[in-house]
């Protein structure tokens, strides 16, 4: 860590390997539940996964110092961008995406940041793609949209950003004409609209022009079927929520933590 690296494994007697989720108000956490189940199912007895539920990112260095068995962290809202200044190294993908959701702690305490959200999105999307899914609308321009855009670039799918207000890089929702909707057969919601408990909310797109040629992907996983997906389903579209993305990004993080690099 900058301004003095932190040694996190200072005793060979400490055999437990600790991993953590960094976030705020994360008692609902998918990650902690997922890794607890993974460790139980795979009989991994020397690992634990805990929550660092913190009010500000400035608290994190002290928590790392206080947890000498800590080897890796996941990072969730609202700290994916705020954590960047604490990193000693960034992966090539993270430099491009600028939103960190995975950190590996080196043997001398250095923090290297990664983004595995794009891996989770890309690898969960590919099985559903058909040749006509060749142009995409990305709803939202926050950190999650950057990971989605990076993945679509890898897949060779051009995309158009959509935001509440028009800009040099984004259309506004008011500019989504029938022609725009029908010429973009992949629509990805990266906004929080529709997340539990506000399940009645949805992005204000003209759903009446969605057809069975469309694939609607919502990064939200709770509820399982958001209003965005339900409205697309009524029009005959294929729908996909964010649960598989979460699983795949978690497994990508696990692979990073256990790699020799």
Annotate the PLM regions.
Residues 169-240:
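Rossmann-like adenosine-cofactor binding region
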Residues 1-15:
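Short, basic, low-complexity termini and linkers enriched in Ser/Thr/Gly/Pro
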Residues 155-171:
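NAD(P)-binding Rossmann-fold cofactor-contacting core
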Residues 16-128:
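Phosphate/diphosphate ligand-binding glycine-rich loop within oxidoreductases
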Residues 75-82, 144, 192-195, 222:
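Short glycine-rich anion-binding loops that position phosphate/pyrophosphate groups of nucleotides
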Residues 123-124, 238-261:
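Active-site capping/gating segments
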Residues 154-158, 235-238:
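Conserved S-adenosyl-L-methionine
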């Amino acid at each position: 860590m900058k301004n003095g690296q932190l040694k996190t494994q200072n005793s060979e007697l400490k055999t437990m390997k600790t991993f953590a989720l960094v976030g705020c108000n994360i008692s609902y956490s998918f990650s902690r539940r997922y890794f607890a189940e993974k460790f139980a199912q795979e009989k991994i007895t020397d690992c634990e996964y805990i929550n660092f539920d913190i009010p500000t990112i400035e608290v994190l260095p002290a928590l790392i110092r206080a947890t000498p068995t800590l080897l890796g962290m996941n990072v969730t809202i609202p700290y994916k961008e705020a954590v960047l200044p604490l990193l000693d190294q960034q992966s090539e993908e993270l430099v491009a995406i600028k939103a960190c959701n995975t950190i590996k702690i080196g043997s001398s305490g250095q923090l290297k940041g990664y983004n595995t959200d794009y891996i989770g999105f890309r690898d969960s999307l590919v099985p559903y793609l058909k040749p006509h899914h060749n142009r995409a609308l990305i709803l939202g321009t926050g950190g999650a949209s950057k990971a989605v855009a990076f993945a679509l670039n890898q897949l060779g799918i051009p995309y158009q950003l959509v935001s509440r207000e028009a800009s040099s890089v984004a259309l506004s929702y008011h500019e989504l004409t029938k022609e725009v909707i029908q010429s973009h057969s992949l629509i990805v919601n990266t906004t929080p609209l529709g997340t539990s408990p506000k399940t009645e909310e949805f992005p204000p797109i003209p759903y009446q022009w969605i057809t069975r040629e469309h694939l609607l992907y919502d990064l939200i996983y709770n509820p399982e079927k958001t209003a965005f997906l339900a409205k697309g389903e009524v029009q005959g579209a294929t729908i996909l929520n964010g649960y598989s993305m979460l699983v795949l990004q978690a497994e990508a993080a696990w692979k990073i933590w256990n790699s020799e690099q």
